[in-house]
């Protein structure tokens, strides 16, 4: 599918500023890729989480990070809590068509003043009879301009910030939902990213996922799958960047010999290849622990942190060896340089990952 339905069109989609999510997700849905780890009763394959990781790792062969990221939202970011905690009615209405690719999903968590600090979100869903009335806004929403529904995190109460939030399935065509703008980004050019505003948006309370006030907890669980997806999606991409750099530096001659013959280059590429393989081993261990029902927060956090670091280190080192050609948009290494920078920011910044790890290690200073 990647060679036939995606890679031939990526350059065109990059220029257009988005990939056709509905058309592509429908093809993925027909192939059974969007619900590999989701319940059979709602159109999924009922397999374990490792199969979602196989999908993610395979998508690393796409010529850019946009399609893997948008697909990751559909599989491992906007739907895990719905699949696990949603009512059968909600799962029929939102999960089933997301698995078939008839619906495009997005995740509404981040806000202008609350990115990694999820507890500080300001969007509210006020109780009004059998409905919630939603006001506020969300920022940096992947798939936001094309989505049919949003898995929205909003404040539904006045209590402590970790116990006053709920996840709500919000149809994007509901009155009062407004896409303010499509955001212009450094990288991930064919992944549409939106700023979205909510003005007196009314949705029935039956659209809430699970219990009221449990949204923060549910979202933290979704973050684990999101972070593991991000790790898996970068592996083959990094390997491809390294392999293409080997090919280029072997063919490119300077001062009478191939660039690759310089020890500083072939040693560095060997180091980077080792780093990728070590990250893969960490991912596979975390995946096994997750399947066995264990808390993978430390392992997923370590993986996300390392993936973010390598997302800067590998494209930067490889681009340097491409020299002037690496600075040209026509080379894939320049796209990797732009796209992979996001891994250190999205889904929890590196600094937040370090804080999480320090908390588990008992080294975080008391507040």
PLM ranges: what are they?
Residues 76-85:
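Helix-loop "lid/cap" segments that line or gate small-molecule binding pockets
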């Amino acid at each position: 599918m990647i060679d036939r339905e995606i890679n031939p069109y990526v350059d065109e989609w990059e220029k257009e500023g988005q990939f056709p999510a509905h058309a592509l997700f429908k093809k993925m849905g027909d192939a059974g890729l969007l619900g590999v780890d989701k319940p059979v009763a709602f159109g999924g394959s009922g397999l374990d989480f490792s199969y979602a990781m196989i999908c993610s790792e395979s998508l690393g062969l796409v010529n850019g990070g946009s399609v893997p990221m948008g697909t990751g939202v559909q599989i491992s970011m906007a739907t895990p809590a719905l699949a696990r905690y949603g009512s059968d009615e909600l799962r029929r209405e939102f999960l089933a068509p997301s698995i078939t690719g008839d619906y495009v999903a997005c995740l509404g968590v981040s806000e202008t003043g609350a990115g990694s600090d999820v507890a500080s979100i300001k969007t509210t869903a006020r109780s009004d009879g059998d409905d919630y009335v939603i006001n506020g806004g969300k920022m940096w929403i992947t798939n936001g301009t094309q989505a049919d529904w949003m898995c929205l995190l909003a404040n539904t109460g006045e209590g402590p910030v970790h116990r006053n939030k709920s996840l709500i399935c919000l149809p994007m065509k509901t009155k009062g939902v407004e896409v303010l703008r499509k955001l212009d980004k450094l990288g991930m050019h064919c992944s549409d990213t939106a700023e979205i505003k909510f003005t007196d948006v009314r949705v029935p309370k039956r659209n809430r996922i699970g219990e009221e006030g449990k949204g923060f907890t549910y979202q933290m669980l979704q973050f684990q799958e999101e972070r593991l997806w991000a790790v898996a999606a970068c592996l083959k991409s990094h390997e491809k960047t390294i392999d293409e750099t080997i090919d280029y530096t072997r063919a490119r001659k300077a001062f009478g010999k191939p660039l690759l013959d310089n020890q500083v280059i072939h040693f560095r590429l060997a180091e980077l290849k080792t780093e990728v393989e070590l990250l893969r081993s960490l991912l596979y261990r975390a995946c096994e622990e997750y399947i066995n029902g264990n808390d993978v927060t430390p392992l997923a956090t370590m993986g996300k942190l390392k993936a973010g670091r390598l997302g800067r280190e590998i494209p930067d080192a490889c681009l340097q060896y491409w020299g002037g050609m690496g600075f040209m948009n026509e080379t894939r290494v320049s796209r990797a340089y732009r796209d992979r920078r996001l891994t250190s920011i999205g889904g929890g910044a590196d600094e937040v990952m370090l804080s999480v790890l320090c908390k588990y290690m008992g080294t975080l200073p008391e507040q």
